[in-house]
């Protein structure tokens, strides 16, 4: 919607006129505009190989996470930091019922859940992003895709998550030997 794009652009410049020290994101997840200080992506890929195909092997200007364009007509990537602000979204199959859901096919158990989380994080770290945020920490209402359930009980042994360390080298995240 061109009106919404115009509104987002106007708000970007109004915000910048009031405070030039802070980055402004005009849209989070997809349909980014030229007037933005960061490019953000939401993508609930099933596995890390999908991240490779979309974000290492392809042009960021042409990717379509979750069926949405990454940039609106005429806008393009101009070297801004890229933040992967939502990925993961894994539900346990036993929880994804009665109106509750996650993204894609649910994990069959705690071991598969852990393995998929680990592989997605490793995949993200291979991509040329400056930051990422896993979706999500806890289950929230009908979204049962958290690392913890709604009572904050872990869905798997979380002690291994600390081993997913990041080594920063030249703008790319590299996997550290586990």
Located regions from the model:
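Substrate-binding clefts and catalytic carboxylate motifs of secreted carbohydrate-active enzymes
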Residues: 13, 52, 56-178
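Active-site neighborhood of glycoside hydrolase catalytic domains
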Residues: 1-38, 79
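Short, well-ordered secondary-structure micro-motifs within conserved domains or adaptor modules
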Residues: 33-45, 49-53
């Amino acid at each position: 919607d061109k009106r919404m794009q115009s509104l987002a652009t106007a708000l970007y410049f109004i915000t910048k006129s009031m405070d030039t020290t802070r980055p402004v994101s005009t849209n989070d997840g997809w349909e980014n505009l030229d007037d933005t200080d960061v490019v953000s992506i939401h993508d609930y890929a099933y596995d890390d190989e999908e991240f490779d195909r979309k974000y290492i092997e392809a042009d960021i200007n042409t990717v379509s996470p979750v069926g949405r364009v990454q940039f609106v007509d005429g806008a393009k990537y101009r070297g801004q930091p890229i933040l992967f602000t939502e990925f993961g979204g894994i539900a346990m199959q036993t929880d994804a019922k009665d109106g509750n859901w996650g993204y894609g096919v649910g994990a069959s158990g705690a071991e598969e859940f852990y393995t998929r989380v680990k592989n997605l994080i490793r995949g993200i770290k291979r991509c040329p992003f400056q930051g990422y945020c896993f979706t999500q920490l806890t289950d929230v209402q009908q979204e049962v895709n958290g690392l913890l359930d709604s009572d904050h009980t872990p869905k798997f042994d979380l002690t291994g998550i600390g081993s997913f360390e990041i080594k920063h080298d030249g703008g790319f995240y590299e996997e550290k030997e586990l």
